[in-house]
Amino acid sequence: MRHYEVVFIVHPDQSEQVPAMVERYQALVTGQSGTVHRLEDWGRRQLAYPIQKLVKAHYVCMNIECGQATLDELEHSFRYNDAVLRHLVIKTKKAPAAPSIMMKSVEREEARKASAEAAATATAAE
């Protein structure tokens, strides 16, 4: 089995259904003796260019280990799901264990927002 990094972009109106979609894709991979090594929900982010007149979309990254038949079925499900705007599959040499650069930036943004909220509540309490 080979290792792959799969990134897919979901329509922003379908953001509520992303967990169900991810669960379905995970079940597809693990059901055919594959493994999901890393799953990252990058959230709603700005697109580099408009896709179908949209400027924001929901990003999800999965690092998986599976066979070619499983990968073909996964790509087929991406292709025929209208909520998935784009997808990218990259073959990798091994499964990374550390968080990706994008996930680190998402965590930094969340920490920055949390500290700003804490500072705002502290000033409001004074």
Swiss-Prot record:
UniProt-recorded name of the protein? Small ribosomal subunit protein bS6
Q: Does the keyword Ribosomal protein apply?
A: yes
Per the record, the similarity remark reads: Belongs to the bacterial ribosomal protein bS6 family.
Question: One Pfam family from the UniProt entry?
Answer: Ribosomal_S6
Q: Does the keyword Transport apply?
A: no
Q: What does this protein do?
A: Binds together with bS18 to 16S ribosomal RNA.
UniProt cross-references to NCBIfam families, sorted A to Z: S6 (TIGR00166)
Question: Which PANTHER family does this one have?
Answer: MITOCHONDRIAL 28S RIBOSOMAL PROTEIN S6, SMALL RIBOSOMAL SUBUNIT PROTEIN BS6M
Gene Ontology cellular component list: cytosolic small ribosomal subunit
What UniProt keywords are attached to this protein's entry? Ribonucleoprotein, Ribosomal protein, RNA-binding, rRNA-binding
Write out the GO biological process terms. Answer: translation
HAMAP family found in the cross-reference section: Ribosomal_bS6
This entry's Gene Ontology molecular function terms read:
small ribosomal subunit rRNA binding; structural constituent of ribosome
Source organism (scientific name): Bordetella pertussis (strain Tohama I / ATCC BAA-589 / NCTC 13251)
